[in-house]
Amino acid sequence: MIIRSKAPLRLGLAGGGTDVSPYSEIFGGAVLNATINLYAYATIIPGGDKTLFRAEDKNEAMEIASETVHGSTGSFSIAKGVYDRVISEFGLKPAPFSLTTYVDAPAGSGLGSSSTLAVAVLGAFAEWFRLPLGEYDIARLAWDIERNDLGMAGGKQDQYAATFGGFNFMEFSGNGKV
């Protein structure tokens, strides 16, 4: 079995930065964005005796024993962070697999590539483990993994744009509601 997932990168059109804490909690925020025909891809092949992370766009790979995936640092922090959270949140037993990712634009490009990668990887794991996650669940969980588990800075528009795609107007309120 091969599981494939992809999520679109986004172009911010207006309101960028108003989705970032603490601004959005104090004043609220609103953004306008559109997804474009550039993507983050994730492919999972279950099985084997070790876990392999491969980032084709960075020409990097890391092989580890399945029970030692925990610890989310370096080039594979997003992929490992998503896996760690999925295993712990849904009470799953770690299993060996190969995860290959590719992003059409590098981190720091301003297109939400890191968050889009988180959404694509989460989508692939959700499919593999048949997790009961809807679109809002995926966007919220991807945001929580990046901001709280991994300590990455940023707002919320990237995860929601990558999950829903298309042309988006989003409002953010002090209670965390999108």
What positions do the PLM features span?
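Anion-binding (especially nucleotide phosphate/pyrophosphate-binding) glycine-rich loop
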Residues: I3, N37-D144
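ATP-dependent small-molecule kinase catalytic core of the GHMP/sugar-kinase superfamily
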Residues: I2-P8, A14-G29, L52, A61-E63, ...
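Short, solvent-exposed loop/turn segments at the edges of secondary structure
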Residues: I36-N37, F164
